[in-house]
């Protein structure tokens, strides 16, 4: 049993707290659907400020919009393999801002499962590790 089982009002409060934590995080956060192309459904303010893409510009698009000439295909293969197996992925990649400038990003991508334990979305936690 969890606290949600004892206090239904706490669930609503917890959702609001988590929404605020995500929106005001210093790290870039993206949520995508678990379907071909992994369309983006949410990015936080830190993501928009860092990449230059507003939420309106990126929601519905593939995260591949951030990739470019120096993004390693082998890394993307490992990423896709992990996602297809429903596993957490952790790695670093060279990606690109809207203005074309490159950055090195550390990623952690976590599958989000629905009530039937089927992956419905992915949570991508990102941070700039450019040296």
What are these model-predicted stretches?
Residues 1-36, 119-131:
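PAS-family sensory modules
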Residues 34, 94-100, 113-114:
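PAS-family sensory domains
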Residues 38-41:
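Conserved hydrophobic beta-strand signature of PAS-family and PAS-like sensory domains
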Residues 59-70:
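PAS-family sensory/regulatory domains
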């Amino acid at each position: 049993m969890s606290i949600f089982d004892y206090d239904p009002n706490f669930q609503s409060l917890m959702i609001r707290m988590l929404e605020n934590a995500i929106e005001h995080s210093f790290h870039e956060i993206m949520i995508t659907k678990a379907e071909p192309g992994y369309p983006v459904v949410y990015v936080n303010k830190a993501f928009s400020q860092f990449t230059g893409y507003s939420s309106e510009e990126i929601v519905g698009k593939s995260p591949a919009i951030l990739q470019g000439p120096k993004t390693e295909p082998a890394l993307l293969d490992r990423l896709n393999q992990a996602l297809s197996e429903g596993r957490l992925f952790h790695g670093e990649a060279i990606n690109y801002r809207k203005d074309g400038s490159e950055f090195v990003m550390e990623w952690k991508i976590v599958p989000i499962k629905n009530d039937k334990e089927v992956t419905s979305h992915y949570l991508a936690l990102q941070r700039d590790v450019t040296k």
